[in-house]
């Protein structure tokens, strides 16, 4: 008797070898993949902005990496300086240290993405949080009270429009880049079972539409 679901994987439309440069961005699933590739001694860099779950924040971080536009301002809460675009691992006690850490990672990512052969983008959730006072979507709420945010669900149209444009920017920046999309299997049950399923459905359909519309893009 078989107590598990076995999935037979087809042959991928690409091959990665030890000469290739690989960058991974997105949810914690991308971090796990990056760790596995590093264990295999592959040339890998992952999450230069830290873990990010929603497609909007992921796209924003990639655009910022392409532009190589430095950060000059950060927020402050609970005696820590932080960026709404970054994971809390970038939060430090002084503004200067925080900006330095953020901008060093930004410049390194710009150079690595320029040379990369593969970019893995992992979506985690279509649910996003908007900071009400600043009217902006954030990658991380940094434990700021919930009352300062509103919760929204990204649409398939929003995600596909955003990434179809981004793919064009990526190809102009690095014509040899192959983009591989994944959707994290990790369930976000804090959103609720049904809400998690809605989110994953939106992400999967969005990814397949993006892949079908763009050359050198694939789904894994």
Segments and roles (model prediction):
Residues 1-220:
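Extracellular glycan-modifying ectodomains
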């Amino acid at each position: 008797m078989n107590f598990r679901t076995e999935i037979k994987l087809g042959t991928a439309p690409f091959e990665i070898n030890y000469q290739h440069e690989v960058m991974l961005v997105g949810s914690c699933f991308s971090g796990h993949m990056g760790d596995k590739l590093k264990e295999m001694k592959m040339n890998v860099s992952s999450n230069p902005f830290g873990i990010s779950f929603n497609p909007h924040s992921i796209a924003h971080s990639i655009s910022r990496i392409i532009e190589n536009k430095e950060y000059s301002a950060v927020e402050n809460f609970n005696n820590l300086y932080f960026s709404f675009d970054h994971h809390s691992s970038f939060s430090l006690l002084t503004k200067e240290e925080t900006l330095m850490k953020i901008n060093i990672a930004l410049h390194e990512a710009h150079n690595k993405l320029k040379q990369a052969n593969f970019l893995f983008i992992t979506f985690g959730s279509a649910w996003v949080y908007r900071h009400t006072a600043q009217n902006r979507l954030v990658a991380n709420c940094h434990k700021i009270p919930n009352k300062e945010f509103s919760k929204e669900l990204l649409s398939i149209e929003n995600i596909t429009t955003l990434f179809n444009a981004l793919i064009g920017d990526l190809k102009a920046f690095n014509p040899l880049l192959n983009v591989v999309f994944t959707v994290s299997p990790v369930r976000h049950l804090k959103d609720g079972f049904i809400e998690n399923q809605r989110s994953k459905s939106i992400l999967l359909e969005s990814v397949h539409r993006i892949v079908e519309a763009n050359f050198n893009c694939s789904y894994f």
